[in-house]
């Protein structure tokens, strides 16, 4: 008997039985080869099927050749794509998992490939990031596109696929754009009223049914609420879902938000679990077909509670399945603590729009999670118990080496413990616990309160291959240390020093912004005891390395809390009581501050180790993100 009976109960979708309620939603991978299914893509989805997922909805699959969504996404606009799709379907089906293709026309969201004609849209209204205005699609073009959707679905069916998803959520792509009043300003039969805006979607559904028959699954993805003034509301979408049911849709996939309001469709760290479940719950009351919800369902118990409490019938679990391909199997077997924790950082998709492959902060091997045994077994010493050190120790031990990890402090985690302190970063604590648990499980010898000395290297560890993960130290600016009360962000987050009430944070990267957020009052209510915080950033961009949703959410919080943000602000001098900066050629002086916090980056703390075989990993080699540290350590250890 598993601990999640509702989650692992089979469900009927149309005329198809799905083995459990864990569905995987579409997540772009950029693994396709000019639209064709590549072997890596087959392996990627097959791994999630092997991991126990009941049904997979693939990333977007374009239905016509003119407009490309992402260079590495799939297409199925002619029969040449069918053989690759058959390999993909067969790879997933061998594990009893069902697979749907998310059919998509990018329209005004197309990638700017050279030679692409003017983009089409419902109206001459494009997204905020568009380089030029789109043109309204003609009725003749819409009729052609409707037929292209039907033909594309039929190719999926020929390849053995179980169905298709029609993407109408997030004001995303042609169909999502037609449905939302934010983009659809038409006055013909495809606009005006909600029925008019829904017409194109209903015609696409009818086209798919015409080509594929009644046994083929059709699901439609919608935003239960766009959370935007003038956008689609929950009441609108209840009506829409009733019409979708009448049109023969087999289930509804309820997301939320849109592409206009950043962070609304893909929730950032710190967001409450299942933020769209209130919409799916209400929609479920008005239709007689299954309803799925999605977003931040990162633990099995959350999914179980959602289904048990009739918030939804199925849970779309995306990023956690990316983070751990065995998510479903581990949940079923009761090995919940062994699930690699998704922290919701969004870095999996950060590079997608630049054409990079999908990746994960916590899982350095998204495509292939296997660790091959070493041909020659060695003795390995890992110096430093931060995330890079723990990853290296785990991988080396997993490969069959004898591993000792020495950490000079009394606990493992390193810089990750400080990173977990700011608001919305608490899920990093799960990563620390997970990494420690793996070391225990593999039997890595961990020595705390142990600083490795030259004598130890010359004697006890003389035959060991050395992996040094000594981390980094926060940078300071010596001329500015004349200020009456200065400290680093690390000093604040570790509790070593306590700031005053009128604070200047120097540096608008992730650490500076998170520290300002941590220190600011929860609400800007002008309470006399509230801290006053000024953040100075010398460039025109906050948190350049942060994921879009996380960056948007944190920036909004800083503004709501009344943090004064000055971009393009170059600090030129500091004395005991005054901080002087220049912005747009004008000099400004801050005289009322009582604390100056340095958040200006980190410098590698490279400890030179005198030994034959030494590998430097993580921040001590090159300061970077958590993802950089774990990935670097993983790759080094795989080659020892």
Predicted regions, residues:
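Rossmann-like dinucleotide/flavin-binding elements
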Residues: 301, 378-405, 448-459, 469-480, ...
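Flavin-dependent oxidoreductase catalytic cores
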Residues: 1-383, 387, 391, 395-398, ...
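Conserved beta-strand termini and adjacent loop/short-helix elements that scaffold enzyme active sites
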Residues: 255, 294, 363, 449-451, ...
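Short beta-alpha connecting loops at secondary-structure transitions
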Residues: 263-269, 290, 313, 416-424, ...
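Short gly/ser/thr-rich secondary-structure transition/capping motifs
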Residues: 2-11, 365-369, 446-451, 484-491, ...
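Short, structured coil segments at secondary-structure junctions
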Residues: 287, 310-311, 442, 482, ...
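Rossmann-like dinucleotide-binding cores of NAD(P)H-dependent redox enzymes
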Residues: 402-445, 516-571
